[in-house]
Structure formats: C-alpha cells, structure tokens
C-alpha cells in the first residue's frame, strides 16, 4: 500500500507533506519551494501552468490566470460573496447551468473543482517525484467552516486530480495535530487555533488529552468566515492606491485590467514588507498613460496606514472567537495555548488583537504556512494504520435540519456535534391522503429554512392514503468522518425507503466528474506530448547550431552540390522549427534529412581528425627515436630515490 499524503489546498498557497516513520517531511516542489501558489494559468497553446510559473506571467495574462478559486468552490452564482468577487476578479465568473459559480477561460467553461484539481495534481506530482513511486491517496484539508457543498466539491477536485480522498479534515484541527504531536507538554490542554489564511478565517477550540498513552484531539467548537482572508486585505490596499492615484493624476486605474494585476502584486508585497518594517514604497513606472503621456505611480505606505485600512477586517475575526469560546463551554482564561495558522497571522496587528482577546501571547513555534499540511500527513498515517496513538474527534460546523410546516427549520443535528454521528426523528404528513413527502435538507443557524443553505431535496413516494398526522415517516441523518451528509426517509407502515448522499442540487454530477477525470488524464497525455515536442525542438536547435559551425570550418572541403544540399536541409529545418504548428514527427523528419545530408561532411571531419592524430603520433615517434640513443645510458642515472618520512600526528 502506498503512502497517504497530506495536502493543504489553500486559497493563496498550497503545501504537501508526508510522514516518514515518526518524522514529517514537507516536500519541496520542482521550483525548490515548500509552498506552491494556488494559481493556474491557461495559455494560448493549450498549456496549463500551475504555481510560480503561472504567477510570473499573471501581469501580462490577467484574464486567463486564475487565483483564489477556493473562494468559489461549492458556491452558487447568486451568493452575495460570489457577486462581490465578480466585481474584483480580472477573470470572468459565470453562472453554470446548475446555478453554480463557474469560470470562463479561453472559451472554456470550468468548474472550480476542475481548476483546483490542477493545484492538487501539482501536489501529487511533487510527492511522487520525492517518493519515486505513484501516489493515489490523500488527506485534504478544508476550512472548518466549509459547508457540505464546499466539502463535497473539494472531494470532487481530489478525484479529478486522480486522488482517492481518504479523509477531508478541518484546517485548524490539522494544525492542532501538528502542534500536539510536536510538543512535549504532558497532561490535558485546551488550545485555540486562530487560522487566518488567504481567503478564509476559522477558529477552533480543541482539547488535547492523554488517554492511556493515546493522544486524543477533541474539537469542542468551531466558527469562522469562509469569505475573509488575505485577499480582502490586499483589496483594501489596492483600493487605497487607486484612490490616491486618482487624486494625484486624475486617472482611474480600476478600469485597467493590466494595471490592476500589477497593483495586486505590489499590494501583496507591501503587505508582507510592512509585517517587518514601518514603511514601504510602491513604485510602478508606466502604470498607465493618457493624452499627456505615460504615468508613473510612486506611493509610500506606513504600517500605521495599513493597519487603519484593515482594522475592520481584523475586528471581524474576533466575533467568531467569542462565539467559539461560548459554544465550547470554556472561559478565555482556560485556554492554555493559542496557535496561529495562515500567512496573514504574521501581521503584527493581527497578533496584537489575538493577544488582546485571549489574554496571552500566541505561540511562535508553529510554522503558519506548513502546520496544516503536516497535520493532514499525520492523519494520513493514522488512516493507513501506521499510527495507533492518535484519536481525532472533529465536529460539524453548522446545524443540519429539514424544512417542516410553515417553512420552519427543524434541526436534526446541532452545530459542534462530534462526527461521525447519526440521528433519526419521526415526522408525519401535513395534508389528508398525502401520497408523497418532499424532504428538503438545510444547513445553517437561522430559524426559518429559507435563511439557510439548501443542500438538497428528495421525495418519498407511495405513502398509503391516511388522515394528516397519521403516517409515520422516519427521517435519518448520518454524517460521516469527512463531514459529508447522508439522509434517509422511511415510511414505517410500508417499509418504503429512500436514501441519498446529499449532493447539493448544484454541485457536479457523476457524469461531469467522470468527464473531468478523463479530461485530466488526456491533459496529462497532452503535457507528455508537449514535453516530447519541446525535446524535439531543442534537438533541432542544437543540430542547426552544430551543423552551421561545422559548415564554417569544413564547407570549403565539400563539393558545391553537397554544401548546397546541407544548406537547403538546414533552411528547411529552421523554418519548421519557427513554425508554431509543426508537430514532433515533422521536426524529427527534418532532423533526419539534415543528418543524412551532413553525412559526407561528418566523414571528412572524421578523416581529418584521424589524419591529424596520425601526424602527431609520427612526429612524437621521430622525436622519441632521436632521444633514445643518448638517453639509454642516462636512464638509470636519472632515477631519484624518493625519501619518505613518517609524520606522526599528535
């Protein structure tokens, strides 16, 4: 059985780790970095770039470079968060036939799980390159506050990437695993994990207990905001720069897609720099132009200014902390450790706010970028049976229920219930002789069903005619360890039953996932073909260079017809290489023609080399014969006895 890898599929960056015995290895990607930007670029020639190469070309290709796709995964197009992103993103977010938010790139309509699968495939390849063997199984992390649709969509992304997702676990829980197994502190501890990433915010209160030598991680409560993160902080800086530039130059940069991409890059850099310095400068020459000529942007931003811009965003993270503490039934003073996860927690103001709320300094000995992937790798080792000393008890983040008479949300499983869990309840009909019931499943905390997220619906038919309130219909909810819901309804009189795994009435159908898996496999084949084509081009370029060099040296020794034949073949090969449409077979055929035409020249070069070597050998032989007569008598006299001394080391 192969190893189960741990993947942190982040909004901004992703990371992959593996357990080797009792030590963890965060794996470097092909660029040598331990984290990979979650950025995917679709090129004109069909090539798909992932990570740093995609990020590098984003300024010149903004409409086809996709970032922060995790904010759209498992979401409906109508959701207000999606509508907010439409106004901000340089790429086109569209409404899919099923009502989900999809993205249109180069006339292709792509689902967020399909795009995220590209990042997961890069993580899979990174692990395979390191291990030297195929990887087919993974534990993937999601924000604790992800709902059922978002978890399902993440699982689909794994499948499209060619991975069997053994478990979906919550990011703060994974970070707690990494922390708990890395630290030597004994006894029971309550920890708070404050996770502010690129696109999402989570807070979890977790109890780590030592039970008969087994470490038990029990999540007491979780809360968060799946649309609050570093991307929003960047946007505040971008808005500020746009406003300042408009004041100074009278030009609105918000309408210029290329300028916006440069601003995004600079805003992110400025934010990072201001975590360690008090002031930074944003300098963007030729940012735009008007009738008076090119315009340059030069702006100083202080840490105080940045903090003023994002103060309200940081404040928004505190309310979920209050709710999580209350739901866990603990007091702030009972928290032993505060763990910071996610790149945004490097910001001094964030650390200050966390300290102010929890009344203690957060721990600095957890890597905020890697802890989540490390925890996922530990859970992978537990699932593979290689680790027996860890038990993880996670919770469902939001209440689950069904719509009952009057549009009321009747809760079946309350938020922060430990999973896996089951619950069944008996309901009846609302009308006389009702022959069928529709079960509508919702997730959320509002009293009325319409205020919550509809996860799915199904019918139970064939109920025998009876007065209202007489039939007994048992509805059962079953949440698995991934936090994914399975619902059943059974008429107790007839035994008729209907069960479904909740697939949101949006989401990808089985057929769509299968098609995307096949497309991904075809893509891998296409990548292989592109690589072979690049190799053929390189071979052709090298042959052109070496043949031209040889022609310069030996051309005059060839007959005119031979020389012309080589030059014609070279010209033909060069034109084929310049043509963007030439395939591998065409290039290889032209290479063969050049090689055949150059055969005579190769023979002449070889003959010349042989002759040169023969002449050298003859000259050396003549010189040696002259020296032998006089040298023979001296031979013994010239031998010097070497004196060796033993050097003793003290």
Curated annotation (Swiss-Prot):
Keyword Oxidoreductase tagged: no
InterPro entries: ATPase_NBD (IPR043129), Chaperone_DnaK (IPR012725), Heat_shock_70_CS (IPR018181), HSP70_C_sf (IPR029048), HSP70_peptide-bd_sf (IPR029047), Hsp_70_fam (IPR013126)
Modified residues (Phosphothreonine): 200
Pfam family, one: HSP70
Swiss-Prot/TrEMBL keywords: ATP-binding, Chaperone, Nucleotide-binding, Phosphoprotein, Stress response
GO molecular function: ATP binding; ATP-dependent protein folding chaperone; unfolded protein binding
Entry's induction text: By stress conditions e.g. heat shock.
Family designation: Belongs to the heat shock protein 70 family.
Function (record text): Acts as a chaperone.
PANTHER family: HEAT SHOCK PROTEIN 70KDA
Protein name: Chaperone protein DnaK
Organism encoding this protein: Paraburkholderia phytofirmans (strain DSM 17436 / LMG 22146 / PsJN) (Burkholderia phytofirmans)
Gene: dnaK
